Amino acid sequence: MSLLIKNGTIVNDDAMFKSDVLVHDGKIVEIAPSIDPTPGLEVVDATDRFVIPGGIDPHTHMQLPFMGEVAKDDFHRGTEAAVAGGTTMIIDFVIPTKGESLLVAYDRWRGWADPKVVCDYGLSMAITSWGQEIAKEMEMVTKADYGINSFKFFLAYAGVFMVRDEEFYQGMLQCAKLRALARVHAENGAVIAERCEHLLSSGITGPEGHTQSRPEELEAEATFRACTMASQANCPLYVVHVMSKGAAAAIAHHRKKGAVVFGEPIAAGLATDGSHYYNEDWLHAARYIMSPPLSRDPSTPNALMKLLAAGELHLTATDNCTFDCHQKSLGKDDFTKIPNGVNGVEDRMSVVWDKGVHAGIIDPMKFVAVTSTMAAKIFNCYPRKGRIAVGSDADIVVWNANATRTISKDTHHHAIDFNIFEGMQVHGVPETTICRGRIVWADGQLRTVQGAGRFVPLPPDSQIVFSAVDNRGKALEPVKVERAPYVATTLEAPDANANIVVKTRSAVPPGGISSIQF
């Protein structure tokens, strides 16, 4: 199967240039200023358009069983929404239940995804329990047969997913040994649990209780703590869904000291804020429930985008985990029972373009970096993914920077009945999405085939991650001080009949006079 993209401007993370792109059997086979079409070759006209690498969303939760419900976007609907928005690969999370084998959970996720995906996908593994067997299974799943190169640790959701600090630290030591990336959901789960109990007992049962139970300081504290522990373990760390300025500042602090830390803001946090939690319409407020919550500071979205521009944050994701209005309403009398999660996989690319490029904060090359290339590099599938180059997979988007669209639940492809970006007009629209040489989105219509996507194994030892770790490790090697053997001085026992003199002095503490013996 072949196709030719003509007259476009190729945008990679490091260059922009006009060129044609020839695709054959799922790969890019030629890039040249002008390629003549052969008879029968399908041609995509990209005049006045950008030709960019397909987006990579490194953080999704398709059909996740969570809080007694199952996320509505399964691997079919979720990946259809992805390609409609210009994303051609997702990285989803295998999340075992407490005490469950990683291998059993892995097989379950592959069984869900393989028959349904319409684009390529990879997997990351959550560690929800700890012990020697888990450590052994971590090593197993980093082998080529499984293709896992990152492990996520939750410092929230006490009693469900959360691990203790010592378990987190031991897990990071194992990650470092395996040359795998540690990822962290950074919140203070113990304090959150106490705050939830206090708020409920005080009569605060609505969605506003969610954000009040999770003040930004707790995200910042947990992020700082996680970075500190990762630094001690000399383990690279990837902080998922950075939602606040404080968390971003914690990452920047440790990076300046040489720690290898990556920060991931998400579409929701770049486009809207936590004022929704105080909306008088209960259901409106509940739709935005996620953890960590959206920042109550309205300047945060713009600040996070500027940190992406400055390289203090590194790539964008969505944490796509969708629950419909009925599922959200299960927590109508108790905010802790509202399923956590929002949409984003369809709208991320347009949101980042609108809030970043159209706003004049980032350029098109940086857009490609934070929506595709950095994810490919960090998760070790570059340049197969994340680049327009000969030999790369033909995951390509023809992008119209001048077009606009209005986001709506009535036109999106998610399996839910609302959209957190409802009514937002965004600049930048994917006109054509190509997955491994197949057009899957064009003219506003899906052309997908269920199960046509493929699993992409992600090998450990990413160069962009571990080259810095290795350099840092040399400076952190323990230093032994060579000393002459210490010879203790033997003291003679005191004479029991010797007079013992006790010296005293007066001390005058505030409020009175006292004689204190020393």
UniProtKB/Swiss-Prot annotation:
Gene Ontology CC: cytosol
Residues the entry annotates as binding substrate: Y157, S291, N340
The UniProt record lists the keyword Zinc: yes
Cofactor(s) it depends on: Zn(2+)
GO biological process, alphabetically ordered: pyrimidine nucleobase catabolic process
E.C. code: 3.5.2.2
Binding-site positions, Zn(2+) 2: K152, H185, H241
A Pfam family assignment: Amidohydro_1
Coiled coil: none
InterPro entries in alphabetical order: Amidohydro-rel, Hydantoinase/dihydroPyrase, Metal-dep_hydrolase_composite, Metal_Hydrolase, Metallo-dep_Hydrolases_sf
Superkingdom of the organism of origin: Eukaryota
Gene3D superfamilies xrefs: Metal-dependent hydrolases, Urease, subunit C, domain 1
Binding site for Zn(2+) 1: H59, H61, K152, D319
This protein's UniProt keywords: Hydrolase, Metal-binding, Zinc
PTM remark: Carboxylation allows a single lysine to coordinate two zinc ions.
Record text on cofactor binding: Binds 2 Zn(2+) ions per subunit.
N6-carboxylysine PTM sites in chain numbering: K152
Reactions catalysed: 5,6-dihydrouracil + H2O = 3-(carbamoylamino)propanoate + H(+)
Gene Ontology molecular function: dihydropyrimidinase activity; metal ion binding
Quaternary context: Homotetramer.
Stated family: Belongs to the metallo-dependent hydrolases superfamily. Hydantoinase/dihydropyrimidinase family.
NCBIfam families, per database record: D-hydantoinase
Listed name of the protein: Dihydropyrimidinase 2
Originating species: Caenorhabditis briggsae
